[in-house]
């Protein structure tokens, strides 16, 4: 897989290696047609003289030699398995000495995207290895990497190897946005790459990633081309895939695309179905299907998705129901009625909706209700803002009530503490007067016994006040 930039180390001058490569091609051809070595001999002779005299090589002359070599290189796919990698590496080394390697590399990539006939089992692995080497010999900003990556993805798609695609996925996730920016691709090439990745992901069974790249390809379509046939076909593909995909519940990125909005005119029933899945419930969906069978929508692209669509619509309906319930408690009977399912199946549908990430909560079998902790809003408009405002007002009133209780209790505590302190002070003064008048009548032991009783009474009053 693509990795940091590397360098091919191959000994020999350009003319020596070109002559060697031509001999190898002639051997693979088995004397069929004109000899490649004899064809390039007149072309490499001036270059050989330049090399011997250590003059600056004529790159245009090299290009003429490379045109012959690269044009005949398709036969490399019939080379012995153990020689294929070294033969292609030699050709890549020669191509890097051209005035413009890009014009040759794209053709080499097309060869490698085709089957390697001498190794049906390991051909894709060999091709990916060679293409990865080519990719890594190019500078990170070299736009030729685009053609190489396209070829890598094409080989993976044709092979159907989920292992190879899994090895490529981390690179796509971490590097693809950076590559697209560095290569400065136009919208058409960016779309081509996203669709190639989507096809490879679908072939390997990763439908979620395939859908992601189809949507990204859709977003490359300029607004002034959103009504073209190509844009319409891609929009129908993206929308159909999203509706049938079991993991797609957010259609925001689709509805924001100009090409999807253009379906309002070209495929009005398909666009109407999108609007139902975006904001409506099962009742509206079933009314729509009764009037517009799936087989009649956009050439029947959804004809095989009836069950998947109904399942998704039930999950979305439950999410809307949970989000719009003020009490945050949904009786089983209410859910069963909204989803058109038996009451005994309610728990299954709630669990499926939780797994889809649309709601969070707890099932209460004892009370036959679903306690909603969190619910996803499918759309967030004026109605939803009003609901949020209402809930915030309820929360505010609740907090104000709690604050009022705390304020009242604090004031009562302060008042009672002050009263207790005043009583303690008054009792202390009366005790001092009694002690002065009774000194002559009491012995010291009696004085010591009588004095502690007064602070003890004050502490009891203070404790009672604090407890209250």
UniProtKB/Swiss-Prot annotation:
Pfam families: eIF3m_C_helix, PCI
GO molecular function: translation initiation factor activity
Disordered: region residues: 42-61, 418-468
Biased amino acid composition, Low complexity: 444-457
A GO biological-process term: formation of cytoplasmic translation initiation complex
Domain PCI: 206-377
Biased composition (Basic and acidic residues): 430-442
Keywords tagged on the record: Cytoplasm, Initiation factor, Protein biosynthesis
Recorded family membership: Belongs to the eIF-3 subunit M family.
Quaternary structure annotation from Swiss-Prot or TrEMBL: Component of the eukaryotic translation initiation factor 3 (eIF-3) complex.
Role, per record: Component of the eukaryotic translation initiation factor 3 (eIF-3) complex, which is involved in protein synthesis of a specialized repertoire of mRNAs and, together with other initiation factors, stimulates binding of mRNA and methionyl-tRNAi to the 40S ribosome. The eIF-3 complex specifically targets and initiates translation of a subset of mRNAs involved in cell proliferation.
UniProt-listed HAMAP family: eIF3m
Protein name: Eukaryotic translation initiation factor 3 subunit M
Species of the source: Neosartorya fischeri (strain ATCC 1020 / DSM 3700 / CBS 544.65 / FGSC A1164 / JCM 1740 / NRRL 181 / WB 181)
High-level lineage: Eukaryota, Fungi, Dikarya, Ascomycota, Pezizomycotina
């Amino acid at each position: 897989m693509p990795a940091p930039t590397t360098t091919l180390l191959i000994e020999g001058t350009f003319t020596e290696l070109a002559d060697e490569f031509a001999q190898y091609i002639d051997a693979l051809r088995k004397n069929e047609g004109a000899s490649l070595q004899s064809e390039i001999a007149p072309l490499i002779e001036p270059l050989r003289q330049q090399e011997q005299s250590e003059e600056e090589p004529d790159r245009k002359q090299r290009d003429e030699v490379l045109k012959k070599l690269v044009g005949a290189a398709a036969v490399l796919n019939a080379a012995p398995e153990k020689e294929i990698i070294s033969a292609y590496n030699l050709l890549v080394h020669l191509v890097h000495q051209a005035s413009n390697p890009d014009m040759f590399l794209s053709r080499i990539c097309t060869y490698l995207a085709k089957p390697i006939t001498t190794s049906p089992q390991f051909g894709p692995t060999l091709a990916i290895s060679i293409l990865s080497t080519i990719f890594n010999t190019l500078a990170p900003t070299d736009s030729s990497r685009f053609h190489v990556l396209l070829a890598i993805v094409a080989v993976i798609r044709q092979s159907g190897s989920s292992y190879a695609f899994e090895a490529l996925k981390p690179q796509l996730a971490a590097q693809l946005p950076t590559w697209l920016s560095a290569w400065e691709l136009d919208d058409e090439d960016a779309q081509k790459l996203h669709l190639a990745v989507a096809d490879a992901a679908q072939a390997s069974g990763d439908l979620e990633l395939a859908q992601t790249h189809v949507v990204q390809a859709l977003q490359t379509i300029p607004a002034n081309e959103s009504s073209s046939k190509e844009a319409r076909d891609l929009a129908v593909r993206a929308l159909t895939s999203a509706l049938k995909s079991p993991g797609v519940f957010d259609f925001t990125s689709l509805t924001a695309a100009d090409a999807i909005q253009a379906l309002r005119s070209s495929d009005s029933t398909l666009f109407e179905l999108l609007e139902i899945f975006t904001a409506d419930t099962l009742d509206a969906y079933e009314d729509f299907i009764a009037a517009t069978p799936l087989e009649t929508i956009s050439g029947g692209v959804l004809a095989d998705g009836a069950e998947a669509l109904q399942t998704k619509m039930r999950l979305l309906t439950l999410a809307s129901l949970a989000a719009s319930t003020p009490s945050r408690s949904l009786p089983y009977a209410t859910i069963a009625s909204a989803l058109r399912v038996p009451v005994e199946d309610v728990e299954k549908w709630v669990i499926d909706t939780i797994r889809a990430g649309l709601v969070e909560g707890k099932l209460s079998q004892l009370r036959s209700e679903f306690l909603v902790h969190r619910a996803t809003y499918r759309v967030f408009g004026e109605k939803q803002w009003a609901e949020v405002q209402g809930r915030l007002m309820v929360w505010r009133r609740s907090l104000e009530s709690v604050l009022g209780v705390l304020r009242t209790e604090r004031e009562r505590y302060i008042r009672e503490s002050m009263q207790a302190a005043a009583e303690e002070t008054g009792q202390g003064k009366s005790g001092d007067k009694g002690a002065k008048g009774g000194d002559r009548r009491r012995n010291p032991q009696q004085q010591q016994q009588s004095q502690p009783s007064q602070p003890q009474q004050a502490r009891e009053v203070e404790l009672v006040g604090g407890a209250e």
